[in-house]
């Protein structure tokens, strides 16, 4: 029937539909009273444009600075930047709050093998979280220390060789090499070989090149009807890239879970729990890729941001070096456990993840069917809500001097007593927060302390505005963080 109509009739029909939809979104929609820019309230294309150009978190922060703690960033989506929103949206369900805000499944589709993973709905998440908590426990972390330390030793060795040749080093690449080699070993029983080769493994390269495809597919999934069909056809190459990426991970996971070994990696703990009543092989494969991505790129980003801000703030660098040398007499004393008690080191990491959150975007949820109260206002059921990390952690309403790197704010400095610390949630919040938080902190403390024990760093001029240049496609699109290293003799 559609094809029997004349082209002008179809065009007129589309124009009428767009106009009617725009009028509805602006004047009749249940979220019409929430503030936001006109185009964002009128059409999803405004949001999609900023996703496409890699500036959505930055734009969202700008909108919060302009409109306040809640912004309508798309016709069906509200963004928040407060501690109260973290509690209302992501917190534990207690008292009268019994219904959860489920993950937005448009943002979190099933794995390419069609199986649910830990990032999906609550019932599925609870089961996977119980099983995956074993390899992430403090006990497991203690048994994994030898594996992790071995790769940090290798990092120091490779950087020392390059420092003695006065080479320019891109620390972003070396942090990625380290974190991916560690997570590859913990997840698959073998590293990606990045530290040894000084090259990025092709699978990791594919992750970074395909992340824009992931965001393109998110845009496509949010556009209904004919437009979605057209864009899906146009996005077949992106889908193929994502499938290839998953197939490699699937192959590696199969190779590992068919081996018989008791080495203390993730798979040993997962398989031990699976013998009781746990994951199917397909579920292990679906979750393996998430474990590697969540535990490697984010840690590398946090380390990159931390080193950058230390190099831009000589007083903080000097204070951290003093703490390191007051704590340790020999490098062999520096371990994941011995760095736990270092107050200023912890403050530096916290502050770096505030001004440069490893995941600066929003992980959206949907309001329960009956609606819910968020920040004192009722939001009807089925709409998208979320807290934007960048907007929350760099808001002057939450933090004094929000764009300044000041580790002392985490050390009891009276100037910052009014900071809203509960707005600071780099690992998310509530029962679905990041399982790998302890592993990430342990790795970051060890790597950073060992680096500062062994080297002095000179930030090259071309990298002095490293952070300001970056765009975001879910993760920071990090440029080179170029330094020269001077080996220290102890």
UniProtKB/Swiss-Prot annotation:
The chain crosses the membrane at residues 1-21. It comes from Aspergillus oryzae (strain ATCC 42149 / RIB 40) (Yellow koji mold). Cytochrome P450 monooxygenase; part of the gene cluster that mediates the biosynthesis of aspirochlorine (or antibiotic A30641), an unusual halogenated spiro compound with distinctive antifungal properties due to selective inhibition of protein biosynthesis, and which is also active against bacteria, viruses, and murine tumor cells. The non-ribosomal peptide synthetase (NRPS) aclP is responsible the formation of the diketopiperazine (DKP) core from the condensation of 2 phenylalanine residues. This is Cytochrome P450 monooxygenase aclL. Signal peptide: none annotated. It holds the Pfam family p450. InterPro entries: Cyt_P450, Cyt_P450_CS, Cyt_P450_E_grp-I, Cyt_P450_sf, Cytochrome_P450_monoxygenase. It is an enzyme of class 1 (oxidoreductase). Its cofactor is heme. Belongs to the cytochrome P450 family. One of its GO terms (molecular function) is heme binding. The gene is aclL. PROSITE patterns: CYTOCHROME_P450 (PS00086). It is found in: Membrane. Heme binds at residue 434. The lineage of its organism: Eukaryota, Fungi, Dikarya, Ascomycota, Pezizomycotina. It is a single-pass membrane protein. Its EC number is 1.-.-.-. Keywords: Glycoprotein, Heme, Iron, Membrane, Metal-binding, Monooxygenase, Oxidoreductase, Transmembrane, Transmembrane helix. Glycans are attached at residue 176. Pathway: Mycotoxin biosynthesis. One of its GO terms (cellular component) is membrane.
């Amino acid at each position: 029937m559609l094809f029997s109509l004349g082209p002008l009739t179809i065009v007129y029909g589309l124009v009428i539909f767009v106009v009617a939809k725009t009028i509805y979104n602006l004047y009749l929609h249940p979220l019409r009273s929430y503030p936001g820019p006109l185009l964002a309230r009128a059409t999803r294309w405004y949001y999609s444009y900023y996703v496409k150009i890699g500036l959505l978190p930055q734009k969202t922060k700008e909108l919060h600075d302009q409109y306040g703690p809640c912004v309508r960033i798309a016709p069906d989506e509200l963004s928040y930047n407060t501690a109260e929103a973290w509690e209302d949206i992501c917190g534990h369900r207690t008292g009268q709050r019994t219904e959860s805000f489920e993950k937005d499944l448009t943002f979190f589709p099933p794995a390419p093998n069609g199986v649910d993973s830990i990032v999906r709905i609550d019932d599925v998440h609870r089961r996977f979280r119980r099983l995956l908590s074993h390899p992430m426990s403090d006990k497991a972390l203690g048994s994994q220390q030898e594996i992790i330390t071995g790769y940090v030793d290798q990092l120091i060795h490779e950087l020392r060789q390059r420092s003695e040749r006065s080479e320019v080093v891109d620390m972003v690449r070396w942090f990625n090499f380290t974190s991916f080699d560690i997570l590859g070993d913990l997840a698959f029983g073998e590293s990606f070989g990045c530290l040894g080769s000084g090259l990025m493994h092709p699978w990791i390269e594919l992750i970074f090149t395909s992340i824009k495809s992931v965001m393109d597919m998110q845009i496509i999934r949010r556009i209904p009807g004919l437009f979605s069909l057209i864009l899906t056809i146009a996005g077949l190459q992106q889908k193929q890239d994502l499938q290839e990426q998953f197939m490699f991970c699937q192959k590696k996971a199969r190779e590992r879970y068919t081996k018989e070994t008791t080495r203390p990696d993730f798979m040993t703990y997962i398989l031990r729990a699976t013998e009781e009543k746990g994951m199917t092989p397909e579920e292990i494969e679906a979750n393996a890729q998430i474990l590697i991505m969540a535990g490697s790129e984010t840690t590398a980003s946090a380390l990159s941001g931390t080193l950058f801000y230390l190099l831009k703030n000589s007083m903080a660098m000097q204070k951290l070096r003093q703490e390191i040398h007051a704590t340790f007499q020999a490098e062999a004393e520096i371990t994941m456990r011995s760095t736990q008690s270092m107050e200023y080191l912890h403050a530096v990491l916290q502050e770096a993840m505030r001004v440069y959150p490893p995941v600066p975007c929003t992980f959206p949820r949907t309001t329960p069917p009956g609606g819910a109260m968020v920040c004192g206002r009722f939001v009807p059921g089925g709409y998208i809500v979320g807290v934007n990390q960048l907007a929350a952690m760099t808001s002057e309403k939450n933090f004094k001097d929000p764009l300044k790197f000041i580790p002392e704010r985490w050390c009891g400095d009276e100037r910052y007593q009014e900071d809203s610390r509960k707005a600071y949630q780099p690992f998310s919040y509530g029962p679905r927060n990041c399982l790998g938080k302890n592993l990430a902190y342990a790795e970051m403390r060890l790597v950073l302390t060992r680096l500062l024990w062994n080297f002095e760093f000179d930030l090259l001029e071309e990298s002095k505005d490293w952070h300001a240049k970056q765009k975001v496609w879910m993760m920071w699109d990090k440029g080179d963080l170029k330094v020269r290293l001077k080996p220290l003799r102890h």
